[in-house]
Amino acid sequence: MAQTAYLKVTRIAMRSASNLSKRRVEELNSGLGELRQLLSCVVCCQLLVDPYSPKGKRCQHNVCRLCLRGKKHLFPSCTQCEGCSDFKTYEENRMMAAQLLCYKTLCVHLLHSALFGELAGMRPQVARELVPRIKLPPKTTQEFIREGSNISDTFDIFLPQPDLPFLKDMPTSLPAETPPTSAVTTPELPYDHHLNISDIEAEAAATAEQGHFSPLPLLPTGSRMGMLSHAGQIVIATESSESGFMDQAWTDQVDLSGTVSVSKYTNSGNNFAVSYVMPTSATTKFDPQELQIGQVVQMADSTQLAVLAAVEETVETSTQLTVLSTTVEETVETSTQLEVLTSAEEPNEISDQLANLQVEESDEALVEETVEEAEGTSIPSEVVAEHMEEDQHLDVHTSQSPTQTEMEEAVEEHVATKTQLGHVQTELQDAESLQKDFEDAKAAAEEAKEKEKDLHAISAELQKEDSDEPTLKRKRTRTLKASQAAKIEPVPSEVKTKVQSGKGALRRIRGKDKEEKVKPPKPKCRCGISGSSNTLTTCRNSRCPCYKSYNSCAGCHCVCCKNPHKEDYVESDEDDDLEDFEMPKDVPEPMTQSEEPVVAEPRQEENSMAPPDSSAPISLVPLNNLQQSQHPLVLVQNEKGEYQGFNIFQGSKPLDPVTVGFTIRVQLQHTDGFGSLPQYAYIMPTIDPPNPPAPSLSPPPPPAPDREVIEPPAKKFRTSRTRRGRANFSALDTVDELVSGGSRSNSAAGDRSSATDNAHSLFEEIMSGSDDL
């Protein structure tokens, strides 16, 4: 249906507006409205975007991809696609997408044709049918044409774009597309083709009746498909705006004998040409009789282009010459300025140059830069001598200057040079003083190094003596070491006071002072790399310095470290200074266990405090974060089987878990390399529940009184009371007696008058017994 409506509208749109009757214009108006309905979404009533159609339906009620689940505005409602509302019932319709591109091209053609003016003020009149359709928005036909020409064409997004810069500004078109033509601009074909224009087409081109003979493309002008593969024709339109309203067609003839074909795109590889109407007063070298409408001219033979190119070259060369001349003049000026400044034999030129420098600010900046480059980073004595000679020449020749202004300027320059020399001399003196201070500081640093070497030798001897002694002797040697360091401390302070005047030397001395404060390195653990046959036992013999000093192994290379000492007496170098002032009075002796020798070694902070009171109760303090534990860690298992961290205290003093009896110790794994989790933790042994007390010999308690349970009386059934046990009744032995009324004779029921009485009495007996149930 949409293709049929498109073909009907296209046949009318390809005709000339001057030959169309009013009825044809109305048909075009109604056809555009019908085509707009068929190409619209039945949900949003706009032109389709990514059209989808119902599967297996022929109603052709298309929707946009984003409107699949929306409410359809069809009047009347469609019974075929009423239940279609998801991607399972809709499928993509690419034919409708191509139809939309054709509709866009049609609207672009109508927008630039004379038919657009004929449709001014008209609204599309759609015939009322019983077919379900949408209602068009309240717009005019011209507004619908503008809407169709502005359809966003997304099909050429992923196509290759032209790489050359001049192709980006070219109007995009397809090889088969023919743009609107006019008397001023006519399209041309490539050079190897010739355009055959009939008389009707020439008349239409001259009277501005464009396009009724040209084929209409199937893709819009915005598409760039095939741009690089095919050398398409260049389209040049007079204006991109829509054509206005015209009361009647333009029938005036235009003289096209003076047209000149000039290349539009000189950078392109193809020799395209466009015909322009030149004014009669224009002087051209072309013969007007030789050129016709649409004639192709090869631009390689054109002389005007050569003239233009030559003019451009001359202009470029002239600008280059001017630039070169200015640069040469500037270089000459700078060179003359440098020569004047460096030569001391021409003082008159120096004074003239100084006068010019004060007038021209740009030249003054250049001179300052050249002077700074000439001086360099260091100022030798030869430069100072040259400045002195220049000062002498200035003093001699200032009287010879012809004008008073030059004399004053020379005097000012002389004063400036003197001040510069004074600054240079002061800087040299400062440098000499800094060098002297640096030499003094260097000598002091060497003396400090020698003393430090002596200190290293003394500490090594003390460590050898301390190898077989207990922990207390080790601490005494540290006090001696600290006293030796205290004696040497005043030396770098004196060095600092000497070198406060210098700048760079002071920084070097400060760095050396820090190096002097560094204490000698502790002996490294060589466990695992000592070359012994059994590397698993090297951590527990006398060859391990860490084991001998009752410390944990530092940098151990063993397969499995067997050193039982997992805590150091002194954790950092700062604790050595604290030991000199705070010595513990009582040091607890280490406790040994049968399973594994574990030494309880309290930290320096615990040693500095008084021993805990033995009478104080022992308490466990829970920890929220195990990494914040500053004391030995104790793990206690709760009722859920989970372990929780605690610190053990006696009063306010921390305790070592070994002293309490916690002998089970586990190694903790560090999942985070930046944490401070303790290496080992002690597990609190599980406390067995107390045994039940033994039974006492006291008499057993009296038994509990029995509770009387009141139960409802059992259902009593009436016992079978024989008739013999009752008065005036005899037992009925057989059924015959019951039927015969109690007679023992074999007689039928009703033979005697007392049969009914007996039956009544029996019934009353049965009913009276039901009261006892």
From Swiss-Prot:
Pathways involved: Protein modification; protein ubiquitination
Binding site for Zn(2+) 5: C539, C553, C558, C561
GO molecular function, one term: chromatin-protein adaptor activity
Family assignment from sequence similarity: Belongs to the MSL2 family.
GO biological process, one term: protein localization to chromatin
EC number(s) on file: 2.3.2.27
Source organism of this protein record: Drosophila melanogaster (Fruit fly)
Subunit structure: Component of the male-specific lethal (MSL) histone acetyltransferase complex, composed of mof, mle, msl-1, msl-2 and msl-3 proteins, as well as roX1 and roX2 non-coding RNAs. When not associated with chromatin, the MSL complex associates with msl-2 mRNAs, possibly to regulate the amount of available MSL complex. Interacts with Clamp; promoting cooperative binding to DNA PionX sites and recruitment of the MSL complex to chromatin.
Post-translational modification: Autoubiquitinated.
Sequence segments annotated as region (C-terminal disordered region (CTD)): 571-773
Result after altering R543A: Abolished DNA-binding. Abolished DNA-binding
Domain notes per entry: The C-terminal disordered region (CTD) undergoes liquid-liquid phase separation (LLPS) upon roX (roX1 and roX2) non-coding RNAs to form a stably condensed state, leading to nucleate the MSL complex on the X chromosome. The C-terminal disordered region (CTD) forms phase-separated droplets with either roX2 or, less efficiently, with roX1 non-coding RNAs. The MSL2-type CXC domain and the Pro/Bas region recognize and bind specific DNA motifs on the X-chromosome.
SUPFAM superfamilies: RING/U-box
Biased composition (Basic residues): 715-726
Outcome, altering C59A: Abolished E3 ubiquitin ligase activity and incorporation in the MSL complex
Residues annotated for Zn(2+) 4 binding in this entry: C525, C546, C553, C556
Coiled coil: 424-468
Bias type Basic and acidic residues, positions: 705-714
Recorded consequence of changing H61A: Abolished localization to X chromosome and incorporation in the MSL complex without affecting the E3 ubiquitin ligase activity
Impact upon substituting N534A: Reduced DNA-binding
Zn-finger (RING-type) residues: 41-85
Binding positions for Zn(2+) 2 per the UniProt entry: C59, H61, C78, C84
Protein name: E3 ubiquitin-protein ligase msl-2
Chief location: nucleus
Positions of the CXC MSL2-type domain: 520-571
